[in-house]
Swiss-Prot record:
Species annotation: Staphylococcus epidermidis (strain ATCC 12228 / FDA PCI 1200)
Cofactor: FMN
Residues binding FMN: P18, M19, E20, K143, N208, G209, D210, G232, R233
EC numbers: 1.3.1.-
UniProt name for this protein: Probable tRNA-dihydrouridine synthase
Amino acid sequence: MKENFWSTLPRPFFILAPMEDVTNIVFRHVVSEAARPDVFFTEFTNTESYCHPEGIHSVRGRLTFSDDEQPMVAHIWGDKPEQFREMSIGLADMGFKGIDLNMGCPVANVAKKGKGSGLILRPETAAEIIQASKAGGLPVSVKTRLGYYDIDEWRDWLKHVFEQDIANLSIHLRTRKEMSKVDAHWELIEAIKTLRDEIAPNTLLTINGDIPDRQTGLELANKYGIDGIMIGRGIFHNPFAFEKEPREHSSKELLGLLRLHLSLFEKYDKDEARHFKSLRRFFKIYVRGIRGASELRHQLMNTQSIAEARELLDTFEARMDARSEV
């Protein structure tokens, strides 16, 4: 195995969860500017597309990263071990420091095809995929859920994954059936930690689900002795979720992050064409808690270009400044 970066991380370490159409190079750099986590994962990249002669072009943007983001982990999904083997070798050549295997995606057209969380129902295939992914020499980690249908599945499933000799296991504390409709099952953390200690004490344990910020993560780590904390949806409510010394942030700071997001989108669009509409999901992160926020979000959602969005921000901030001077 190449250098196992996981062993060099602080305890507890913090990870920005991989999220489809979210954790691309643009948003990762915005989060870095606000408050950087210890580890970044890419958005989801499909092994079949990567291994297809034509498909590689469709996933190229998903695997784009810069040196200042290291350690960078490629988050990949599929169900054919030979494709994971091929991709693991390619990812090592690209400079990634690790590979994370998606065994938790609950989306129907993924799970019902035996991929993502569907692999919970295919434990032998999951094991083959994990072993095949070690071919490139990078440390292999897994992100999964407690089970597919029922919480009671967690012990047999997680025991099986722990037995595969992986670097890190990130557990979203819900089942596939639960999606994100119920509270994460924090009450199981202690038992999961005990199982890890018995089966695979050298595998790091990362917890995910309903963790809004670094402070909450530290409390969980101190209480249960887990190694890592993964924050996902919490970043939508607070882009400063990873900051070590939390403080109040002004609307100017939030709008400044939006301007940075626009600039980075423009910068990386030159390397890999990106649809402007993909920006719209991010506006609510930055435009909040200020007079006129709802109207500004509505206007931004109707923009068609970076220039239009910037013009709206210029006008809005000019009005803000004028009101503050009165």
